[in-house]
């Protein structure tokens, strides 16, 4: 098995390919990416047979921006017989995976794959039973064993392989299933909700998204992102010249400040969160975010960077490198993650958490 499949947003295959090629090369793993426009996935083929396994085990999935999921696969299975698709799949996985903890039969996130997804749902039950009989899956689901992936790219045509539960997306097809809240003021609320699920471990929510925290939402109108913070019982300063939804103002938790998000300066020193979804050039937003972090105006931030039409991976990489350089220059240790979320379009979402000062004499967050 010398290939890695990476699922991505349709239309962003080139960015996904550029990223995996770059980040694999930094680990001295070389290969080439097979890219098909709007396919919703990329196949990265390694020159050395064991390198695909190295990628899915050692390249942190959390470091990838454009990939929704990542798993190692073998050769493409073609023309599966309609009367017995199971036997060839079991044959491909025998000797490759032993006692996997979960099965995911998936497709790319495209309109063309919607019919295929119906088949995948029906096919999962008999395939799971056959894989359990063959010892490829355990008799019960467990998050401690590898995930078995069967990825259909067309009827009767699939890749088979696996990923590791501590280095993959926990979500089917890499997509969290979120429901739009009827009382939210805009659909953008789902971006922040998804970001919280992707960037913050579930067992840390009560501590890091606690009742009574203070938060700032820059460019808040009409309040889609503020809504998520209010839902977590935070006190929110919503900064925007445009009006906020009355339903949010009625909670008593929101202070609306009619100011430009780029000019606003906080007057409290205990702000836990700053969030920002402003339509502006990514370099300008990155500079503002770096300013907030360097000055210690917030502990954690989630913000969006709008992408240009070309060289998107390069642009995002430069923006993240700028923020990292500013933090390094001021002796601030921080954790930076970026991801193009399912609910993002021509943008990526970034999370930065200040951890501690790298120089003596300063105490930041633990």
Curated annotation (Swiss-Prot):
NCBIfam families: PRK11760.1 (NF008734)
Main localization (coarse): cytoplasm
Biological-process GO terms, alphabetical: methylation; rRNA processing
Active site residues per record: 306 (proton acceptor)
Organism of provenance: Citrobacter koseri (strain ATCC BAA-895 / CDC 4225-83 / SGSC4696)
Gene3D superfamilies from the UniProt entry: 3.30.2300.20, 3.30.70.2810, Vaccinia Virus protein VP39
This protein's name: Ribosomal RNA large subunit methyltransferase M
Function (record text): Catalyzes the 2'-O-methylation at nucleotide C2498 in 23S rRNA.
Gene Ontology molecular function: any one: S-adenosylmethionine-dependent methyltransferase activity
Subcellular location: Cytoplasm
Family: Belongs to the class I-like SAM-binding methyltransferase superfamily. RNA methyltransferase RlmE family. RlmM subfamily.
Lineage, opening ranks: Bacteria, Pseudomonadati, Pseudomonadota, Gammaproteobacteria, Enterobacterales
Recorded superkingdom: Bacteria
EC number: 2.1.1.186
């Amino acid at each position: 098995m010398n290939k890695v499949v990476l699922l991505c947003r349709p239309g962003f295959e080139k960015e996904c390919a550029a990223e995996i090629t770059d980040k694999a090369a930094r680990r001295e793993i070389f290969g080439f990416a097979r890219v098909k426009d709007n396919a919703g996935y990329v196949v990265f083929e390694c020159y050395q047979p064991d390198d695909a396994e190295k990628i899915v085990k050692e390249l942190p999935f959390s470091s990838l921006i454009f990939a929704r999921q990542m798993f190692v696969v073998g050769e493409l299975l073609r023309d599966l017989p309609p009367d017995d698709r199971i036997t060839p799949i079991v044959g491909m996985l025998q000797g490759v995976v032993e006692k996997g903890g979960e099965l995911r039969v998936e497709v790319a996130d495209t309109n063309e794959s919607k019919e295929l997804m119906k088949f995948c749902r029906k096919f999962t039950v008999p395939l799971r039973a056959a894989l359990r009989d063959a010892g490829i899956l355990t008799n019960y689901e467990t998050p401690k064993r590898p995930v078995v992936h069967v990825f259909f790219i067309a009827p009767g045509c699939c890749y088979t392989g696996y990923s590791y539960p501590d280095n993959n997306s926990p979500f089917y097809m890499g997509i969290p299933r979120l429901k739009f809240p009827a009382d939210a003021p805009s659909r953008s609320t789902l971006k922040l909700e998804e970001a919280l699920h992707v960037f913050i471990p579930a067992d840390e929510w009560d501590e890091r998204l606690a009742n009574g925290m203070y938060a700032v939402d820059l460019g808040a109108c009409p309040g889609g992102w503020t809504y998520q913070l209010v839902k977590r019982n935070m006190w929110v300063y919503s900064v925007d010249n445009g009006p906020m939804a009355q339903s949010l103002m009625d909670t008593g938790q929101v202070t609306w400040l009619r100011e430009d998000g780029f000019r606003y300066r906080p007057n409290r020193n205990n702000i836990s969160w700053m969030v920002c979804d402003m339509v502006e050039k990514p370099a300008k937003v990155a500079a503002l975010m770096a300013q907030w972090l360097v000055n210690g105006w917030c502990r954690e931030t989630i913000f969006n960077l709008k992408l240009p039409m070309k060289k998107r991976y390069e642009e995002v990489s430069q923006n993240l490198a700028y923020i990292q350089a500013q933090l390094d220059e001021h002796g601030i240790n921080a954790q930076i993650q970026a991801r193009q979320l399912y609910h993002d379009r021509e943008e990526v979402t970034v999370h930065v958490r200040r951890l501690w000062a790298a120089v003596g004499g300063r105490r930041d967050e633990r």
